Regions:
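Catalytic core of nucleotide-activated saccharide and alditol-phosphate transferases
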Residues: 96-152
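N-terminal pre-catalytic "stem/leader" segment of glycosyltransferase-like enzymes
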Residues: 1-111, 123, 129
Length: 152
């Protein structure tokens, strides 16, 4: 795939450097990549609240974090929003990004089974492409495509 001249907004959790390897590979394909951690913070409590879907306890922190991101990217010309294992970014935030970047294509990838991610299916309808590493997930909806894990 040639991404020459394209800009990718990458929202992915910091996870053993995978996000940096993915960013580097997108750049090797020619893309300009703007990366932000999908989580507003990586401390223990933030991770617990997100993982247990108790985001209401940190909703102000999440809202402020994404307002800052939207402010930072508003003047960019973004072609793709690449969401990896999204848990924190709200559908409303994605809609705001899409309203600014009208032609943006949204790609979601889950490297954990959908059954383990309570909010995973929320991203299905807003995504142009939706991938899971779990071959069982493709049975949930015809829009879900199988994409095995990568290795570094």
């Amino acid at each position: 795939m040639n991404l020459s001249g394209k800009t990718v907004l990458l929202l992915a959790p910091k996870f053993f450097g995978y996000e940096l390897e993915i960013k580097k590979e997108l750049e090797n394909l020619g893309a300009r990549v703007i990366y932000f951690d999908e989580r507003p913070k990586n401390d223990f409590f933030t991770k617990v609240f997100i993982r247990l879907n108790l985001k209401s306890f940190i909703s102000k922190k999440i809202d402020d974090y994404y307002k800052n991101i939207i402010q930072e990217i508003k003047d960019e010309s973004i072609d793709f929003l690449f969401l990896i294992a999204p848990e924190t970014v709200s559908i409303e935030t994605i809609k705001q990004i899409k309203s600014i970047h009208k032609n943006i294509k949204i790609i979601s990838y889950f490297w954990d089974s959908i059954k383990n991610k309570k909010t995973a299916l929320e991203y299905l309808n807003i995504s142009d492409k939706y991938f899971s590493f779990d071959s069982n997930d493709i049975k949930i909806d015809k829009k879900i495509q199988f994409l095995p894990l990568f290795y570094i």
